[in-house]
Amino acid sequence: MMKVLIVDDNASTREMVKIILQRTGHEVIGEAGDGDSAIKAFADLRPELVLLDIIMPGKSGIEVLSEIRGLDPAAKVIMLTAVDQDAVNSDLLSNGAAAIIYKPFSFDDFEKAFSKLK
């Protein structure tokens, strides 16, 4: 079981992710709807895993990933995105994302991404 922070500007997406995480035995310790809130929540809560959307108002998920890496280089971050572009994806992975889950997602997508954390 991991303590997880969910970051997505869409409340419905956050709720779906929360349900999947709870069904797989993980604990959602926080949620954020924008980049600045995400960084504050990460600093305050110190989750074991961050599920992070890329396209959000204000700071993008890419910027948030960089700031999280600055706070904790060992932080585990899985990106959530509808963007399936090789250049963006390789940039995310080279900047420390453990995996990428594409929207629309399924339960299996989370299991596959979580297996990359071990």
Describe these PLM feature segments.
Residues 34-37, 60-63:
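Acidic catalytic/metal-coordinating carboxylates
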Residues 7-8, 32, 50:
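Conserved sequence signature across two-component system core domains
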Residues 11-30, 95:
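Two-component/phosphorelay signaling modules centered on CheY-like receiver
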Residues 45-51:
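Active-site beta3 strand of CheY-like receiver
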